[in-house]
């Protein structure tokens, strides 16, 4: 259960987020009219141009990275039709809500790479690299609701700097990059070995529910 402080902080973060959306939307309208805040739940679209249909995903940041996707292991595996030994790896590495797959080894109720069979680790890493463009499609371009965006906006909150990137250009960086696995996380690095994405078990908030064991992706400003 969330504390009152967490609830208050979450409410304030949403309020500030809406303010930032409006600031960026207003800025876009100084360049081209017709932009409105879209902000439908469970989509990547934050701003859309009603005249052209062009849509944007907004990332308001204070660091060089920010969360870009969060989903339960169950939903992820269903979406990508993952089963068998590969599904076993996801259940071990990210954990199963309400179960302790570590049998008491971990306070997070999950296993890390060094505690999982090398064959399973290899199969999972192969899957991530064989599906790197499809993963990008989900975590950046369209989510799981098939509402694609055309551009990603990187809004630096401390400086107010706003940069706009074509999602197709970002996908080109993915095409030439690769996923690598560490003991507790996976990283995606581009052709220059710069980190572009980070994947971890969320591991925060109320313990051992589906949110706690979710796949949480961060995107890094390497472009």
Specify the residue positions occupied by each region the protein language model found.
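Nucleic-acid endonuclease domains
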Residues: 1-45, 49-51, 58-223
């Amino acid at each position: 259960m969330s504390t009152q402080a967490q609830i208050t902080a979450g409410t304030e973060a949403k309020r500030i987020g809406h303010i930032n959306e409006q600031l960026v939307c207003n800025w876009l309208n100084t360049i081209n009219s017709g932009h409105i805040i879209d902000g439908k739940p469970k989509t990547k679209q934050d701003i859309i141009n009603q005249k052209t249909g062009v849509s944007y995903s907004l990332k308001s940041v204070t660091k060089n990275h920010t969360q870009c996707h969060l989903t339960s292991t169950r939903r992820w595996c269903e979406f990508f039709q993952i089963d068998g030994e590969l599904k076993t790896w996801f259940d071990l590495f990210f954990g199963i809500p309400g179960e302790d797959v570590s049998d008491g080894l971990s306070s997070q109720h999950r296993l890390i790479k060094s505690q999982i069979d090398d064959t399973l680790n290899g199969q999972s890493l192969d899957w991530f690299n064989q599906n790197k463009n499809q993963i990008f499609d989900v975590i950046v371009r369209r989510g799981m609701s098939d509402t694609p965006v055309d551009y990603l906006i990187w809004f630096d909150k401390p400086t107010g700097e706003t940069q706009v990137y074509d999602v197709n250009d970002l996908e080109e960086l993915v095409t030439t990059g690769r996923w690598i696995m560490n003991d507790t996380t996976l990283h995606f690095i581009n052709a220059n070995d710069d980190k572009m994405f980070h994947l971890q078990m969320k591991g925060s908030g109320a313990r051992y529910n589906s949110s706690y064991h979710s796949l949480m992706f961060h995107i890094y400003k390497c472009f």
